[in-house]
Amino acid sequence: MAAEFRPRLRLLATSRRRWCHDVRVAQSEDPEDFIAPAAHRVRPGTLLLANTDLLEPTFRRTVIYIVEHNAGGTLGVILNRPSETAVYNVLPQWAKLTTKPKTMFIGGPVKRDSALCLATLRVGMQADGVPGLRHVQGRIVMVDLDAEPDNLAPMLEGVRIFAGYSGWTIGQLDGEIERDDWIVLSALPSDVLIEPRVDLWGRVLRRQPLPTSLLATHPIDVSRN
């Protein structure tokens, strides 16, 4: 499922700077927060939802946000796999900016000893030309964990840090989609920083048209049916 890919990641053991801003997630009035465009192909900013028949524990009922998709392969992070490890214990300088529950999320099975950070820009902010930020889609950006935090804090609603990632080589993901392992859908900015108590998998499906939305009624534990 996951394959070797070489993104720009931050090794967890190399963090040194201190974070000194406590930025809370703000109320947004951006229209794109509520309307996701139709997704017909994989590209940065799309979601991969595990289909109901994908029962492999690593990816069952996962929602993967695609960060990179190019000639080198595809990279994404699982949005709904929180760990019990506090960000403060791993990257303390980012703890105050991290949205609740302020824990590391498991981005996937590849390179679990490295970290990747996504953030949501405040409404009206642009990432173009800002050192330390790389635009992904809409208000979602990738954050360089080696950047100067003081310069980025005023622009960001919040961040989420992922240990590891999910990756595919050229053509590998296409094959998995063809055999219906994944459903390709568009993301809303709120999906990236969603609280773990929310069933993101079901939430994304429920906002789709019929018949896709009916998949949200699929039981979590099919053995109980």
Question: Model-derived features: where do they sit?
Answer:
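Extreme N-terminal basic, low-complexity initiation segments
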Residues: 2-10
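A short aromatic-anchored loop/beta-hairpin motif
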Residues: 9-12, 16-225
